Amino acid sequence: MNRIAFVAASAAALLVAGAASAQDTQSVAINASVAPKCGVSAQQTTVTLAADLTDADAKVRSGVTTEIANALNGARIVAFCNGVNNSVEIKRAVLARTGATGTSTTEGGFAQFIRYNLDATLGGVALDSTSTDGASTVASRFGGHISLSDSKTHVLFAQAASNGAPVASSNGSTPTATNWSSLTDRRLAAGAYTGSVEVIVTPGA
């Protein structure tokens, strides 16, 4: 009697276990986000133009802006923005003679500043021009591929379509301003000249 009851109980347990083994599922959604980000880096932070900035008459050579652009391209500046409607500003400081005081000509009527302007692109996307004040809004994302060897990931510079030609200059309000004059009738004072180009990227949406 006791044995029969035990067998019956075991059979019931097997029935319960069999019912519990039926498949059941539950999915859980995962929500996350990627924040808009921008970044910029350069493999070189100093470039040097090998040639004299002037011709035999001490006037600015016509190829100086292109030489600056080529030197900057060689620095391999990599930039990205993973969102849209990003702010991009390229600032250039005019080439200034070391030791220059004020923003006018020096003794003898020689110029001591050179104005030039650059247009910048990345992977075929126009970024900004130093020929205009302020930042540009770049609607599309750019710089998604991480590669130092691929020029399509680099900020590429070229002589600006507007006021890009190099020229002796004076009386700009700041080194990066667009209001530097054009002194086409001036020679350049001898000395070392320095300038700079700054790339500023700010994420949009």
Name the predicted role of every residue range:
Residues A126-A165:
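Extended, solvent-exposed segments with strong compositional bias
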Residues A17-A19:
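N-terminal signal peptide c-region/cleavage motif recognized by signal peptidases
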Residues I4, G108-A111, S140, V155:
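Short non-domain terminal segments
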Residues A22-V125, A160-A205:
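N-terminal small/polar-rich segments of proteins
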Residues M1-A8:
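Bacterial N-terminal signal peptides that target proteins for export
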